[in-house]
From Swiss-Prot:
Lineage of origin: Eukaryota, Fungi, Dikarya, Ascomycota, Pezizomycotina
SS bond partners: 43-72, 51-66, 52-57, 73-92
Alphabetic keyword roster: Cell wall, Disulfide bond, Secreted, Signal
Compartments where found: Secreted; Secreted, Cell wall
Family per record: Belongs to the fungal hydrophobin family.
Changes seen on gene knockout: Does not affect pathogenicity in a corn seedling infection assay nor the production of microconidia.
Function in brief: Aerial growth, conidiation, and dispersal of filamentous fungi in the environment rely upon a capability of their secreting small amphipathic proteins called hydrophobins (HPBs) with low sequence identity. Class I can self-assemble into an outermost layer of rodlet bundles on aerial cell surfaces, conferring cellular hydrophobicity that supports fungal growth, development and dispersal; whereas Class II form highly ordered films at water-air interfaces through intermolecular interactions but contribute nothing to the rodlet structure.
Signal sequence region: 1-18
Protein name: Class I hydrophobin 3
This protein's record includes keyword Endoplasmic reticulum: no
Main location: secreted
Length: 96
């Protein structure tokens, strides 16, 4: 029983160390610049703009439109509007 407690504490400590640090050490998304000079983030020429939300990035509801979430996705796959699996969402960075 003692081994299980020690293993549990070590697992929680490892998870805490692997968690991202708050404050100035957060990872910033690569937005690819601004869109037409209006300071709105835009995707680079090598990326496609994909709209999705949470698990909707991988499995989209048929006919669902974009809400407030937008992602830049680097992929050679075509944009599949209304498809069940969005291939572009597998390599994405969120646009703020």
């Amino acid at each position: 029983m003692q081994f299980a407690k020690i293993a549990s504490v070590l697992a929680m400590a490892a998870a805490a160390v692997a968690a991202p640090a708050p404050g100035n050490y957060e990872v910033e998304p690569r937005t690819g610049g601004s869109n037409n000079g209006n300071n709105q983030p835009a995707c680079s020429a090598q990326s496609s703009n994909v709209c999705c939300n949470g698990l909707g990035c991988l499995v989209q509801i048929l006919g669902a439109g974009c809400s407030t979430k937008s992602y830049c996705c680097q992929s050679d796959a075509p944009l599949a509007v209304g498809a069940l699996v969005n291939v572009n969402a597998l390599n994405c960075v969120q646009v703020l």
